[in-house]
Amino acid sequence: MVFDVWKSLKKGEVHPVYCLYGKETYLLQETVSRIRQTVVDQETKDFNLSVFDLEEDPLDQAIADAETFPFMGERRLVIVKNPYFLTGEKKKEKIEHNVSALESYIQSPAPYTVFVLLAPYEKLDERKKLTKALKKHAFMMEAKELNAKETTDFTVNLAKTEQKTIGTEAAEHLVLLVNGHLSSIFQEIQKLCTFIGDREEITLDDVKMLVARSLEQNIFELINKIVNRKRTESLQIFYDLLKQNEEPIKIMALISNQFRLILQTKYFAEQGYGQKQIASNLKVHPFRVKLAMDQARLFSEEELRLIIEQLAVMDYEMKTGKKDKQLLLELFLLQLLKRNEKNDPHY
């Protein structure tokens, strides 16, 4: 869906009214950016681009702006953020909005204006008259958070928009390296396309050569190596992080966050929750939940709780300066490796 919108915009095709909604911030922001590039010239954007936040600005003002002729250009772009009245959420309004005026506008929009409602909400209230009117008269685009497979598919399709191809294995590895962040995937695909030049395919080797692991992904890999009893590789990742001037206290905090996520994921999975439900409950990216689910199978609940307790003690000791931070973290990692070696049936 989103690629169809981007393809149309690249051809210069626009709709008079858009309603962009969903929780995937990158898809919302990137789509708005592409609409802006298509509709408004750089030279006239100061005159013909208006942005309103309905938590602060009256809706009437946005509609009045939409009905104003563009100045020194063919079209005007009006972006309206946070139209919370499209949801079922009850909140105390700072400003009273004239919603009926918006209903009238979208049924007969100004031919020289592109009007964008930017609604960063998971769902719109389908019962509302305005939502029904939007579904009938506006172009609707949902920017939902993607699971692991959808993120891989997104990566493959993103390469296609650049007239390049990337295989599933290479795409999965790229997604893994950037922790599933769509904005990072976009940047890395741009970089990879530039690197391969006239060559059509982005290979796994290209990805391994050019894409650096995020700090979060390094922490995931560190824990992964530990649970798979790879002592040398575990310590190599840790020492590499120190060489990159990452603070031990920051590394420890990320390790702690990951183990808490593993424990929470394990609990919800045992209650029968799926990946998407767990991500929604924990308010984390579905891709992070997938990685945590894989690691959760390698620990008992008791082990996870003990590790989290040890990390809490270490956090206190680091912050009070009682012991050397690097030494504390090294000892913790070695103890964790020793525990997993003892749990190895071949040990």
UniProtKB/Swiss-Prot annotation:
The keyword Transit peptide does not apply. Keywords: Cytoplasm, DNA replication, DNA-directed DNA polymerase, Nucleotidyltransferase, Transferase. Its EC number is 2.7.7.7. One of its GO terms (molecular function) is DNA-directed DNA polymerase activity. One of its GO terms (biological process) is DNA-templated DNA replication. GO terms for cellular component: cytoplasm; DNA polymerase III complex; nucleoid. It is an enzyme of class 2 (transferase). Pfam families: DNA_pol3_delta, DNA_pol3_delta_C. Disruption phenotype: Essential, it cannot be disrupted. InterPro entries: DNA_pol3_clamp-load_cplx_C, DNA_pol3_delta-like_C, DNA_pol3_delta_N, DNA_polIII_delta, P-loop_NTPase. The keyword Transferase applies. It comes from the Bacteria. It catalyses: DNA(n) + a 2'-deoxyribonucleoside 5'-triphosphate = DNA(n+1) + diphosphate. It is found in: Cytoplasm, Nucleoid. NCBIfam families: holA. Belongs to the DNA polymerase HolA subunit family. Component of the DNA clamp loading complex consisting of tau(3):delta(1):delta'(1). The DNA polymerase III holoenzyme complex contains at least 10 different subunits organized into 3 functionally essential subassemblies: the Pol III core, the beta sliding clamp processivity factor and the clamp-loading complex. The Pol III core (subunits alpha, epsilon and theta) contains the polymerase and the 3'-5' exonuclease proofreading activities. The polymerase is tethered to the template via the dimeric beta sliding clamp processivity factor. Part of the beta sliding clamp loading complex, which hydrolyzes ATP to load the beta clamp onto primed DNA to form the DNA replication pre-initiation complex. DNA polymerase III is a complex, multichain enzyme responsible for most of the replicative synthesis in bacteria. This DNA polymerase also exhibits 3'-5' exonuclease activity. The delta subunit is the wrench that will open the beta subunit dimer. This is DNA polymerase III subunit delta. The lineage of its organism: Bacteria, Bacillati, Bacillota, Bacilli, Bacillales. The gene is holA.
